[in-house]
């Protein structure tokens, strides 16, 4: 049965069987139920924090626990999301969650870091960690408890997906390692990291009903990403396993449906995969307005509702007082709310929030010094809301380093590095210059004016400044006594031709933008319409190249673009991809162009000749009547380079490719089996669901006398001892059997899954089985970094040709040799067995490959048989 939207909006005991969907067409997949929601047990490094959480939650009343689980409403307090508080026990203000994965959104005096996709291009674990730690320091200094990042969803199934730049790479191993290092950095700075968007959030269009309807599409449910179990485990779940193993405190569930069940009430993905199989000990928070039911979401594994209201500023909540009603009437077991509160407080203690916490010293809603305490309704005290705390520290230096380390040299025919002696330097393209409205002149960066250093949406930050390529290069040229001629209007082709014909070197800057689906730029509804350059970029390149035989092209983009029609033009002597480098953009690219930094970046995605080279297109039209658009992941694990390999298609630039100002050689591959332990499937049962504290009567949870009620603020208290009246649910009184799934409220001991047993999954998955070493030699005349990459062939008839498993970034002086040594774990060599519901190393022969990209693998050897 489906409720009307209004009925759903006011119910506290809404349809709980969140995984039973009756699709319009019978062949559509549905997500199997998995209940009850596993309770945290403090495994591994979580033990101390878990015990402290249990101690404080045991002292909380029901409404205090509920207050931790529910945001107070959009724009009700300083942060984009803020829970209720528990002042009686020292939590004097609610937990503050704030965007984004690359810096602080809606703030000031903060840094704008390079995007996640740039971190992936560095292939550098240390830089990923340092960037995470620097961001965490800034969030902590602003009084933020929870950073809403990093992202591994979207992973990158679609090269034109709107938010792939927020994450890292379409390869799960590369993403997983850098995802985990970023999380460690953020949390070592004392801030809870949020791994998002869990899971299969691979496109923007149709992610939300109201958003789609605003664009003229009459759908009633959000898009469903339909995936098989093997693909889920081997591709999309892989980096989230790394995040859980790294100790991430929060995971954000996504807007989309997974196999026709909403991401924030999908018991298969939340209860089974995340909490039972991966042993996640932190809390699951909803994406903003991705919460679709009361009891259903609670039983399916959601722990925190953000921002608390159903629609922004409507004053209604699935949880809050409705959660209190649900516990009192027995539809939500008390142990489930206890577990929510324990999970939240465990993450809080694990990162040290109790030691480091200061109140938020900024307002997301105004840059003015003073404003109302509750901005959405202009109520509460008129007070100082912005302290203008500068949190940037010395992070500009790191930002510049990551920017240059992530610049991929795709082509170089003797053009680079520049000598500094070039007498006339032409700079071409709007992407070289400033946004005439200012670097933050477009709300949420929702435009493409000037140089592209950050894409658009909630995954953004406010620039403290933006060094453009024009500024940095002009300074360089003038310092060296040269002349510089910028033409930064893409329509000025005549002027470009004139300047190019006179220039010693012509530097062309072009871009391609994308972002979140609530903003449309030039008809790009978050996702890109195509993979071409924006603002006449191809014509700018062709114009300059036809008048200059030393044309260097620099691309700022959110992902791959089509370069096949111009990349091999002999007048184009160099091509660089600089991604989205953040505030130090110009300085970063100048460091590479002038040779202060030897480029070492490798492309974290494949550059195809056409959009069709990548496989299935985005779902851009409803394909299920007015119901949920269906996105079938029928390609399985074959995305990006795996898909190109399967089709034997030669890309323009393969995954992992990147040039240097020096050269490297690979030799002496050695493969040695280790005495790894035998794989032991997890067995046994959990303990029973623990309960902390006691539950009183409805009268104990009435709205406190004398407390001034703020309009639309989400409270945990009841308005009446009549639970039906307090819930305002027109369907109140249904029998539990009508809407509560079987076993959903069962708090008895539960079997431990074979693939589970510890955070990240079965601990024997991570045992080293094989040691691999290779010698890397700098055969050139310039010191530099090389990124050795290790790929494995898993051998099965339906497996990718190779899959990335290990990598590193190694510095070598001219002529220097180093032996790179790494290991392969059981997980690296295993496949997911759907029938056994476990990881299995198959009988098929396996091989290991080492080289500088997915297509340049000069070293190869068979792998020994291991189990």
Swiss-Prot record:
The gene is bglA. This is Probable beta-glucosidase A. It catalyses: Hydrolysis of terminal, non-reducing beta-D-glucosyl residues with release of beta-D-glucose. Transmembrane segments: none annotated. The lineage of its organism: Eukaryota, Fungi, Dikarya, Ascomycota, Pezizomycotina. Pathway: Glycan metabolism; cellulose degradation. GO terms for molecular function: beta-glucosidase activity. It is an enzyme of class 3 (hydrolase). Belongs to the glycosyl hydrolase 3 family.
């Amino acid at each position: 049965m489906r409720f009307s939207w209004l009925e759903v909006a006011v119910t506290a005991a809404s349809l709980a069987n969140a995984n039973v969907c009756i699709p319009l067409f019978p062949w559509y997949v549905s997500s199997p139920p998995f209940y009850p929601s596993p309770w945290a047990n403090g495994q591994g490094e979580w033990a101390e924090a878990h015990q402290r959480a249990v101690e404080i939650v045991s002292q909380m009343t029901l409404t205090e626990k509920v207050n931790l689980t529910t945001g107070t409403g959009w724009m009700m307090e300083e942060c984009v999301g803020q829970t209720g508080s528990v002042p009686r026990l020292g939590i004097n203000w609610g937990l503050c969650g704030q965007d984004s994965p690359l810096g602080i959104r809606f703030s000031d005096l903060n840094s704008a870091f390079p995007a996640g996709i740039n971190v992936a291009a560095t292939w550098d674990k240390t830089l990923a960690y340092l960037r995470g730690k620097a961001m965490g320091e800034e969030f902590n200094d602003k009084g933020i408890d929870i950073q809403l990042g990093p992202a591994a969803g979207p992973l990158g199934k679609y090269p034109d997906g709107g938010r792939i730049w927020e994450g890292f790479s379409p390869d799960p191993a590369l993403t997983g390692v850098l995802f985990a290092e970023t999380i460690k950095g953020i949390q070592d700075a004392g801030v809870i990291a949020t791994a998002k968007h869990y899971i299969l959030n691979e496109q923007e269009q149709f992610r939300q009903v109201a958003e789609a309807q605003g664009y003229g599409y009459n759908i009633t449910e959000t898009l469903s990403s339909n995936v098989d179990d093997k693909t889920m485990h081997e591709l999309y779940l892989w980096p989230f396993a790394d995040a859980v193993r790294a100790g991430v405190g929060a995971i954000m569930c996504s807007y989309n449906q997974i196999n026709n069940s909403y991401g924030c009430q999908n018991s298969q993905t939340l209860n089974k995969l995340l909490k039972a199989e991966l042993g996640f000990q932190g809390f699951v928070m909803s994406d903003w307005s991705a919460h679709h039911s009361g009891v259903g979401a609670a039983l399916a594994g959601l722990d925190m509702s953000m921002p608390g209201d159903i629609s922004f500023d409507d004053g209604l909540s699935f949880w809050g007082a409705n959660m209190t009603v649900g516990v009192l009437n027995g539809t939500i077991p008390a142990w489930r709310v206890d577990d929510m509160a324990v999970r939240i407080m465990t993450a809080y203690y694990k990162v040290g929030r109790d030691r480091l916490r200061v109140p938020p010293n900024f307002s997301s809603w105004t840059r003015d010094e003073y404003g109302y305490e509750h901005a959405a309704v202009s109520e509460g005290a008129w007070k100082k809301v912005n302290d203008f705390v500068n949190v940037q520290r010395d992070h500009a230096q790191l930002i510049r380093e990551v920017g240059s380390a992530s610049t991929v040299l795709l082509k170089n025919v003797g053009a680079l590095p520049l000598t500094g002696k070039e007498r006339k330097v032409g700079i071409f393209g709007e992407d070289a210059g400033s946004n005439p409205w200012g670097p933050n002149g477009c709300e949420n960066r929702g435009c493409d004016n000037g140089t592209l250093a950050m894409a658009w949406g909630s995954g953004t930050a406010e620039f403290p400044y933006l060094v453009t390529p024009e500024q940095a290069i002009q300074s360089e040229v003038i310092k060296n006594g040269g002349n510089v001629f910028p033409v930064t209007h893409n329509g000025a082709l005549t002027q470009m031709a004139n300047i190019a014909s006179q220039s010693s070197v012509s530097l062309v800057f072009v871009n391609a933008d994308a972002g979140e689906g609530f903003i449309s730029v030039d008809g790009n509804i978050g996702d890109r319409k195509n993979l071409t350059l924006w603002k006449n970029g191809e014509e700018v390149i062709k114009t300059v190249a036809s008048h200059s035989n030393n044309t260097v092209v620099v691309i700022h983009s959110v992902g791959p673009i089509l370069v096949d029609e111009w990349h091999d033009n002999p007048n184009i002597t160099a091509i660089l991809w600089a991604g989205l480098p953040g505030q130090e953009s110009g300085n970063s690219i100048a460091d590479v162009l002038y040779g202060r930094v030897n480029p070492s970046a490798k492309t974290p995605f494949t550059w195809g000749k056409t959009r069709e080279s990548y496989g299935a297109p985005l779902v851009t039209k409803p394909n299920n009547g007015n119901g949920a658009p269906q996105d079938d992941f029928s390609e399985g694990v074959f995305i990006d380079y795996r898909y190109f390999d399967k089709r034997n298609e030669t890309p323009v630039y393969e995954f992992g490719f990147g040039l240097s100002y020096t050269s490297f050689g690979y030799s002496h591959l050695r493969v040695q089996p280790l005495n790894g332990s035998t794989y032991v499937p997890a067995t046994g049962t959990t303990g029973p669901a623990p309960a902390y504290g006691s539950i009183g009567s409805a009268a104990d949870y009435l709205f406190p006398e004398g407390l001034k009620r703020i309009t639309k603020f989400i409270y945990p208290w009841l308005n009446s001892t009549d639970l039906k009246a307090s819930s305002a649910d027109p369907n109140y009184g249904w029998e539990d059997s009508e809407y509560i799934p079987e076993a959903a409220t069962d708090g008895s001991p539960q079997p431990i899954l074979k693939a589970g047993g510890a955070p990240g999954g079965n601990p024997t998955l991570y045992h080293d089985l094989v040691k691999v070493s290779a010698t890397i030699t700098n055969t050139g005349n310039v010191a530099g970094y090389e990124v050795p990459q290790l790929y494995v062939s898993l051998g099965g008839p339906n497996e990718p040709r190779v899959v990335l498993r290990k990598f590193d970034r190694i510095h070598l002086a001219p002529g220097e040799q180093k032996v790179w040594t790494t290991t392969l774990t059981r997980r690296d060599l295993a496949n997911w067995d759907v029938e056994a519901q476990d990881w299995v190393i198959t009988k098929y022969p396996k091989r290991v490959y080492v080289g500088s990209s997915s297509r340049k693998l000069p070293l190869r050897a068979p792998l020994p048989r291991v189990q």
